[in-house]
A protein has these predicted regions:
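A short beta-strand motif characteristic of beta-propeller blades
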Residues: 1-2, 45-50, 85, 90-96, ...
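Short loop/turn segments that connect beta-strands within beta-propeller blades
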Residues: 41-44, 81-84, 126-128, 175-178, ...
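Canonical WD40 repeat/beta-propeller blade segments in eukaryotic WD-repeat proteins
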Residues: 4-19, 54-61, 93-109, 140-155, ...
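Conserved beta-strand element within WD40/beta-propeller blades
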Residues: 27-30, 67-71, 112-116, 161-165, ...
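Blade-level signature of beta-propeller repeat domains, shared across WD40, Kelch, NHL, RCC1
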Residues: 235-271
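Active-site surface patch of divalent metal-dependent phosphodiester/phosphate bond hydrolases
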Residues: 311, 315-430, 441
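Catalytic lobes of large eukaryotic enzymes
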Residues: 234-237, 271-272, 315-318, 326, ...
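WD40 beta-propeller blade core
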Residues: 37-38, 77, 121-123, 171-172, ...
């Protein structure tokens, strides 16, 4: 349709019509010059134009048979229905003033909620006077929340309005008494868009990630998350009319990458996948697989030191560990700090000379890893039952991280598609002193993924650790299905939740081990040690950062993982060669830094 080059459309709304058959045939367009254009979509004609505002029309709202237009100066114009039963650009209007600085607004029935930064005000545009128009005398706001960026309502919770904030929080207000029903911390990233879809709340982030939340439970449950766009998601729109027109519920996302994408609002594939997993025992045969996973921050110790008298307890530890396991099918050894990460010379070399590595230094590090591989091989030969031969499946290393996996010889021929990768998290993802080694394999028709992690250190770095594990789990370290041209595993049902195997969470069974570095919050060292001596572990676990994040943070990626009950004393941090907690100058408080977590969709 022809238009002037200077015309910039800044807002749009479908015009109410007199009959249902005419619905969706006409639109109003607000422009940067303050004009409103009425367009006949069917005939592609400009019906009317009116200079309704002096400033840019930033929003157009629809309520019943009325339309409301808001400009950037804060002028709100009310277009009531005419004798024809629908609003007209020719009729007389009412206007009100609202504060400038609009960051978000949403029409909820006869109410208009307008946010300016952190403040939210509620108005009644159909009012006849200024007193009736301003519903609240003072704005709504909550301490420690960022600016409002987005908002939505959910049909199953129609009494509430949900607002997204720049700091990843969602505030919830009651539409009847305007009380704050809660503030939920769902992410550390900026929420750029919200939409109510059925019973769920969809959220778009400045990272391009989309999340679907079930808000009916406490804490909220993440039903699904995925990378919807390469850049920020600026809008999410549910299209309920598609239910009767196309027999599906469509959700449209628009990103600043100039891409518009359409998603299944019913999450049908996920629903089917869940139902199928519930019935898989009816159609599949299963064999139990015993996997022994050990995680150890070895503090740069060498295998040769383990044999020395003052380290005999460590030597016995490995012997006792293997004997206690019986005869597992898979043995996973995950080490952290096989190189001294506190040696600034070593870590600086590995970073600054990453392009031109020192051969001598690399040889030293490689020798350390080989020494441990050979030592573990000898331990297995010495301590595991003689009638079960084990073979080395894979080893991997990355600046102190070392993974060594053995499997029974009888199992090796059934294992296909062994792929490995690494995810660096040190120095903003550039350095491997923190991060993860990941291994994927397909055993018969099941996919397994093992992660050996070392996350950010520091008592106060919970958010940093949460970001580390999120980045690791959101990475795409593996080749996608089909795994090879001549693959005997060509079907995609070896992966979970419709995944193609490129991501860690696509695998049916995931096991994380490592020095996750989560500490005990708001409790001094002496108090922690006192509770340890009294065996009052439940009191300490109440303040465990990992467990707290799982309880309070719906977006915490480890919520999808389970963990065996913790019945042992904190594993961090001991004086070298002793059972005494750290008495160095730093005097670090004990904590359960070393963890093993698993996700098995009912199979672990």
């Amino acid at each position: 349709m022809a238009h002037s080059e200077n015309m910039k459309v800044t807002s749009i709304v479908f015009k109410p019509t007199a009959t249902v058959e005419e619905e969706g045939t006409q639109i109003w367009l607000g422009t940067s010059s303050g004009e409103i254009h009425e367009i006949d979509i069917i005939n592609q004609q400009l019906l009317k134009t009116k200079s309704a505002h002096r400033r840019e029309v930033i929003k157009l709202f629809r309520y019943a048979s009325e339309l409301w237009s808001l400009d950037e100066s804060g002028e709100l114009v009310i277009w009531k229905k005419s004798s024809s039963g629908m609003p007209s650009l020719d009729q007389q209007t009412n206007s009100f003033r609202v504060p400038r600085g609009h960051t978000f607004s949403i029409a909820c029935g006869e109410q208009l909620w307008i946010a300016t930064g952190k403040d939210i005000r509620v108005f009644k545009p159909s009012a006849r006077s200024d007193e009736e128009f301003q519903v609240l005398r003072s704005p709504l706001n909550q301490l420690n929340t960022g600016d409002v960026t987005s908002g939505a309502t959910i049909s199953s919770h129609s009494d509430f309005v949900y607002f997204g904030h720049t700091d990843g929080k969602v505030s919830i207000y009651n539409r009847r008494d305007f009380s704050c029903a809660g503030v939920i911390n769902v992410s550390v990233y900026k929420i750029s868009s919200l939409a109510g879809v059925g019973d769920y709340l969809w959220a778009g982030y400045n990272t391009g990630m989309a999340y679907v939340y079930d808000t009916s439970c406490t804490p909220w449950k993440v039903k699904k998350d995925w990378r919807a766009h390469e850049k920020q998601i600026c809008s999410i729109l549910a299209e309920p009319s598609a239910v009767w027109n196309l027999n599906r519920l469509q959700v449209i996302t628009l990103g600043t990458d100039n891409m518009l994408r359409i998603w299944d609002g019913m999450l049908e594939e996920d629903w089917l996948d869940t139902r199928m997993h519930e019935r898989d025992s009816d159609f599949c045969s299963f064999r139990e697989l015993k996997v022994a996973v050990m995680t150890w921050n070895a503090g740069a110790v060498k295998p040769s030191h383990v044999h020395q008298q003052y380290m005999s307890q460590d030597n016995n530890f490995l012997r006792d560990y293997m004997v206690d396991q019986g005869s597992p099918d898979v043995l996973v050894f995950g080490f952290q700090e096989l190189v001294d990460l506190e040696n600034k010379k070593v870590t600086a070399k590995s970073f600054f000379k990453s392009k031109k590595k020192d051969p001598a230094e690399q040889e030293h590090m490689s020798h350390q890893y080989r020494a441990w591989r050979d030592y573990l091989t000898r331990c297995i030969e010495d301590f595991m039952p003689a009638d079960n031969k084990y073979v080395l499946l894979h080893t991997a290393s990355m600046v102190g991280l070392f993974t060594c996996i053995f499997v029974k010889g009888s199992l090796r021929s059934r294992i296909k598609h062994v792929h490995t990768s690494e995810v660096k998290r040190g120095m903003g993802g550039l350095h491997g002193n923190k991060g993860a080694l990941v291994l994927r394999m397909v055993l018969d028709d099941s996919s397994l993924c093992f992660l050996n992690c070392h996350l950010a250190a520091g008592q106060t770095q919970t958010i940093h650790r949460n970001n580390d594990i999120a980045a690791i789990l959101e990475a795409e370290p593996f080749p996608a299905n089909p795994l090879s041209q001549d693959s005997s595993v060509a079907h995609t049902d070896i992966f979970a939740s419709g995944g193609d195997g490129s991501m860690i969470m696509d695998h049916e069974i995931c096991i994380i081990n490592g020095d996750l570095n989560y500490r005990i919050d708001t409790m001094g060292r002496d108090t922690v040690i006192k509770h340890v001596k009294e065996n009052n572990l439940p009191r300490l676990l109440e303040r465990d950062q990992l467990l707290l994040s799982r309880k309070k943070n719906p977006g915490f990626r480890l919520r999808a993982f389970a963990e065996a009950p913790i019945t042992f004393a904190p594993t961090y941090k001991y004086n070298v060669n002793t059972d005494d907690y750290d008495t160095s100058e730093k005097k670090r408080a004990p904590a359960w830094c070393d963890r093993v977590l698993y996700r098995g969709l009912g199979k672990v």
